[in-house]
Amino acid sequence: YLLWIVLFCNVTAGIGILEDASPMIQDFFKGHILAAAAGGFVGLLSIFNMAGRFFWASMSDFLGRKATYFIFFTLGAILFFTLPLTRGDHLNSVPLFVAIAAVIISMYGGGFATIPAYLKDLFGGYNVSAIHGRLLTAWSTAGIVGPLIVNGILDHYVSNHLNKQDAYPQILHIMCGLMVVGFVANLLVRPVAEKHWMAEQNLAPVGPGH
């Protein structure tokens, strides 16, 4: 259940960026970002999403899965908190905004790619498929909750004739909070107690005909 929370928080926060990436960069830097450039930004995030799966999964082989998620949530919380400061009425830095968003999305992809190995480390290879199938409900749930959070807040600002640009810091700070929750859940993950290990004779043989 702790790993469910870990994956849910990581994916929800990542979707919070992907869900509204193009409008977000245009609203952050009004009049400076064309629609075509915003589309290119979304394409760049897709590349970092894919690259992050290779990079972070490989790094986890050296750092360990728990330590890798420690980086995801610690760095993620800092980046989500910092991202609103890049907008036009603050630092006004498009390159910094793009760089931060790209790193966040790389960790979103990396978290999804690293979780099967995390499961194997905790439960052994024999149980990974069944447990991973259940864990994917966290991804499905995050795919619903993430857009609900983002669109719910944006709709509130638009319907009340408020400045839409002011909605994004609130959204990103919620994602920062999710990073903190995920950090705590990951911190509490412990190896399975030896008393729950399956005896070797109880494992079904694997081979032709099975």
Where are these regions (language model features)?
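A membrane-interface helix-boundary motif in multi-pass transporters
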Residues: 152-177
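C-terminal ends and interior cores of transmembrane alpha-helices
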Residues: 75-90
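Multi-pass alpha-helical transporter architecture, strongest
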Residues: 174-205, 210
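Extracytoplasmic gate region of multi-pass secondary transporters
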Residues: 1-57, 112, 116, 143-151
